[in-house]
Structures are given as structure tokens and as C-alpha cells.
């Protein structure tokens, strides 16, 4: 299916690009999330009429992400969980837990933006994680998992 991108999409293209993608990817992900429209004459004309507005919105989103990224870069988040004597957690720390801890510090981010390349954290200690605020803004934070005292 041919689509027009309404914003930058990682590994696909930039604002205004007409690209060919699989039908399911377009119908189930890109179009419902407002990232793309079908490429037909009417939508192409509408896009060209709104191009300046869309570019301005993209620039505003990027500036906001860079501003939050500057505050978030290098931040340390502490999360306490019950752990055994050997340092293994009873359970794990997921990206939702990290997003919740960041929200407690005043940063409203989606849990899907927290990247955990090795999966959920299952050990006590410090771990470097990435937060993708925008396709062009990826910052690094440190998550310190602490063991709670057992009674």
C-alpha cells in the first residue's frame, strides 16, 4: 500500500515521503495512530495544503522532546524491590515501573519509550537504559534497583 507519512517514522521515512508498506502495517498501525494517510490524489492535495502546518508541529514536538531530554539526560532513578540474599529480585523491574518512577519525579513519558534491550531487570544494581522521547531524541538514564529490607 502506498502511504504519505505525516511525521518522521524510524526506518521508514520523513514527513511528506510517499512510501510503500505492507497493508497490515499501514491499516493497523500507521493510519490509526495518525502517522500516515493513504496516498491518493485527494490526500496528496490535502497534504500539500497542510505541509507547512505539519512541519511546524513536527518542529514543536522535536523542540519539546529536546527540552525534556536535556533535563532527563543522565538522571538516576531509584526503584526498591524485594530481593533474595543473592541479589536476585522476587519479580522484576519493567519499563512500566521505570516510567512510573519517572512520573513520580515529574517526567510524564509513555512506558513504550523506555528501551530495555536485555529485558526486565532481575538483579539489584545500576543499569543504563535509553528513553526515546522522539525518533531523533534518545537519552540515557541510570536505573538503580535497590533491595528492600525483609522483616
UniProtKB/Swiss-Prot annotation:
Which SUPFAM superfamilies does the UniProt record give?
L9 N-domain-like (SSF55658), Ribosomal protein L9 C-domain (SSF55653)
Q: Does the keyword Nucleotide-binding apply?
A: no
Q: Which InterPro entries match?
A: Ribosomal_bL9, Ribosomal_bL9/RNase_H1_N, Ribosomal_bL9_bac/chp, Ribosomal_bL9_C, Ribosomal_bL9_C_sf, Ribosomal_bL9_N, Ribosomal_bL9_N_sf
Annotated Gene Ontology cellular component terms: ribonucleoprotein complex; ribosome
One of this protein's Pfam families, by short name?
Ribosomal_L9_C
Which terms does the UniProt entry file under GO BP? translation
Arranged from A to Z, the UniProt key words for this protein are: Ribonucleoprotein, Ribosomal protein, RNA-binding, rRNA-binding
Q: Does the keyword RNA-binding apply?
A: yes
Care to name a GO molecular-function term for this sequence? rRNA binding
Q: Which PANTHER family match?
A: 50S RIBOSOMAL PROTEIN L9
- What does the sequence similarity comment in the record state about its family? Belongs to the bacterial ribosomal protein bL9 family.
- Write out the function statement from the record: Binds to the 23S rRNA.
Name assigned to this protein:
Large ribosomal subunit protein bL9
Organism, as annotated: Azoarcus sp. (strain BH72)
At the highest ranks, the source species' classification is:
Bacteria, Pseudomonadati, Pseudomonadota, Betaproteobacteria, Rhodocyclales
> Gene of origin?
rplI
